[in-house]
Amino acid sequence: MKKAKETKVVIFGDYDTGKTTTLEQLCDKITKVEYKGTTLALDYGNCIVNGEKIHLFATPGHERFKFMLEIISNGLDAAIIVVDNSRGVTLAEKEIMAELDEKNIPYVVFSNKQDLDDSELEIDSEVEVFPTVATEGSGLMEGLEVLLEKLN
């Protein structure tokens, strides 16, 4: 029996952008390491998309946990950057995009919280942006599928 292809996708974003909620919507079961609702180390889940097993890791967004980004990012195939559309792209998110661009790692941006602010996200990069509402699951799978197509 042929083993299904496996892909590691890391979900980045500043604090409180909806990374964990995005992961919860995309995966049936997830593992969280958190304290009082704040991700401390990482969140993990997996799902099958078009016969491919996807391992999803959500990073902590708070500055004090930034050291975890490098650990979680080791060996990633692709990335999702979740931006709170009501705040716009933060400096931390711009830095992550620049690093992904430098390493030629494919990524997409989820312009999240469209239910709070549906204005168009202003972004300097040529990256594909998907309007999302993570609490409703809106736009998430479409964005993930496009990201996975970039790998093939």
Curated annotation (Swiss-Prot):
Keywords: GTP-binding, Nucleotide-binding
CDD domains, sorted: Ras_like_GTPase (cd00882)
Keyword Ligase attached: no
InterPro entries: Gliding_Motility_GTPase, P-loop_NTPase, Small_GTP-bd, Small_GTPase_MJ1339, T_Tr_GTP-bd_dom
Positions annotated to bind GTP: 13-20, 85-89, 149-152
Molecular function GO terms recorded: GTP binding; GTPase activity
One Pfam family of this chain: GTP_EFTU
Recorded family membership: To M.jannaschii MJ1339.
Record-given protein name: Uncharacterized protein MTH_765
Organism: Methanothermobacter thermautotrophicus (strain ATCC 29096 / DSM 1053 / JCM 10044 / NBRC 100330 / Delta H) (Methanobacterium thermoautotrophicum)
